[in-house]
């Protein structure tokens, strides 16, 4: 009783087609499809550089930089 059958949906689709016209609906569908495609391409592009931006981890410490940081801290005191 409360659900919509296939006939209800067909009538709604017919009314929408009459109001907007098939050309306008086709343009809306094309725009929506290209927007979804652009979004997916953007998501793929944003995932790839994230892996490339990771810095390689080395087990060594730059002693000169460590000493420079200590000397600047002692100059502040």
From Swiss-Prot:
Database matches in Gene3D superfamilies: 1.20.5.3310
Annotated InterPro entries: TatA/B/E, TatA/E
Feature: compositional bias, Basic and acidic residues: 64-77
One GO location term (cellular component): TAT protein transport complex
HAMAP family to which the protein is assigned, alphabetical: TatA_E
Protein name listed in UniProt: Sec-independent protein translocase protein TatA
Function: Part of the twin-arginine translocation (Tat) system that transports large folded proteins containing a characteristic twin-arginine motif in their signal peptide across membranes. TatA could form the protein-conducting channel of the Tat system.
Organism domain of life: Bacteria
UniProt family annotation: Belongs to the TatA/E family.
Gene designation: tatA
Assembly and binders: The Tat system comprises two distinct complexes: a TatABC complex, containing multiple copies of TatA, TatB and TatC subunits, and a separate TatA complex, containing only TatA subunits. Substrates initially bind to the TatABC complex, which probably triggers association of the separate TatA complex to form the active translocon.
Pfam families in the cross-refs: TatA_B_E (PF02416)
UniProt-listed GO biological process terms: protein transport by the Tat complex
Annotated region (Disordered), positions in chain: 43-77
GO molecular function per UniProt: protein transmembrane transporter activity
Organism annotation: Burkholderia mallei (strain ATCC 23344)
């Amino acid at each position: 009783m409360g659900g919509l059958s296939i006939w209800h949906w067909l009538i709604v689709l017919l009314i929408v087609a009459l109001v907007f016209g098939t050309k306008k609906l086709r343009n809306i569908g094309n725009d929506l499809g290209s927007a979804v495609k652009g979004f997916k391409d953007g998501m793929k592009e944003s995932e790839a550089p994230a892996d490339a931006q990771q810095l390689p981890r080395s087990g060594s410490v730059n002693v000169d930089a460590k000493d420079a940081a200590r000397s600047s801290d002692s100059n502040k005191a």
